[in-house]
Amino acid sequence: MALISLRQLLDHAGEFGYGVPAFNVNNLEQIHAIMEAAEETDSPVILQASAGARKYAGEAYLRHMVLAAAETHPDIPIVLHQDHGSSPAVCQASIRSGFTSVMMDGSLREDMKTPSDYDYNVDVTRRVCEMAHAVGVSVEGELGCLGSLETGQAGEEDGVGAAGTLSHDMMLTDPAQARDFVARTGVDALAIAIGTSHGAYKFSRKPTGDILAIDRIREIHEQIPDTHLVMHGSSSVPQEWLEIIRQYGGDIKETYGVPVEEILRGIKTGVRKVNIDTDIRLAMTGAIRKSLAEDRSEFDPRKALLAAKKGARSVVKLRFEAFGCAGQASKIKPIAMEQLAQWYR
């Protein structure tokens, strides 16, 4: 199946009331794991590449691995999404490279560490929407800074994360401002700030309403019911994988992620895209540590990497099933990018 746009996939998810996990990918094993789980569950896929992933693997390598995935799994719709673009120029390069969706993160300045002002965010996001929509490519924007309501820290992943201590107002998207932002930019999807953060260390305890503002999602959705909402920093940090890592020599302190049941509350009130990275990293790291420890004479890295792929696949499958994605892939008929470009006009 040809690659599809984020807008088409999230429109389908909105119509049928499910959420789509968006998995960050860096290598072959991760893409294999995601596609195998998608095939098993008949789920559509969002494969997204951060700046760190593009630097690590090379954009051309990532693009061709995703094209290979589309060729190998012709019945699975795939969105190729650029995560956290730092400027219109970065987004333009990704569009030219074949990405079907880009994120312009104007909540931060181009250094991806300095919080921006509202007018800057509107300006750069609007410019990307005009450019992307002209060729049928979808755009995700961000309003508010990702950060922990518990600590005031943004967390950092692949070089993205506001520096310093943030105020609660900065870390919570304002619903009325969200309405204005969407009207002025034309984004297809909006990443919102509700107290989640990048990385494994999100919360020091199982999150409750004082540090995870799930109820804010409903307030935002009521203001922009036709714009798809996105949760970033939404790995659940499975405790079983933390225990395996520790059991086989890892040193990870106590930490908690976003519970799946809280994500499901978000999906019921307008969240359609859920970004997940850390969960796959934990599963792969735990599986590799276990594999190497159980056979110390093994020197073929493929054995450990196969174990890593199996671990990642188990996490991905659980998310597809939990979010209501399973069984949806075969219902989606691709819309050509040229046709979408006409629709945007």
UniProtKB/Swiss-Prot annotation:
Source taxon at top rank: Bacteria
Cofactor(s) the record lists: Zn(2+)
What biological processes does GO assign it? glycolytic process; reductive pentose-phosphate cycle
Residues the entry annotates as binding Zn(2+) 1? H84, H198, H232
CDD domains on file: TBP_aldolase_IIB (cd00947)
Residues annotated as binding Zn(2+) 2 are: D105, E142
Note on cofactor: Binds 2 Zn(2+) ions per subunit. One is catalytic and the other provides a structural contribution.
Involved pathway(s):
Carbohydrate biosynthesis; Calvin cycle; Carbohydrate degradation; glycolysis; D-glyceraldehyde 3-phosphate and glycerone phosphate from D-glucose: step 4/4
What family is reported?
Belongs to the class II fructose-bisphosphate aldolase family.
Q: What does this protein do?
A: Catalyzes the aldol condensation of dihydroxyacetone phosphate (DHAP or glycerone-phosphate) with glyceraldehyde 3-phosphate (G3P) to form fructose 1,6-bisphosphate (FBP) in gluconeogenesis and the reverse reaction in glycolysis.
Q: What is the designated name of this protein? A: Fructose-bisphosphate aldolase, plasmid
What is the source species? Cupriavidus necator (strain ATCC 17699 / DSM 428 / KCTC 22496 / NCIMB 10442 / H16 / Stanier 337)
What high-level taxonomic lineage is stated for the organism? Answer: Bacteria, Pseudomonadati, Pseudomonadota, Betaproteobacteria, Burkholderiales
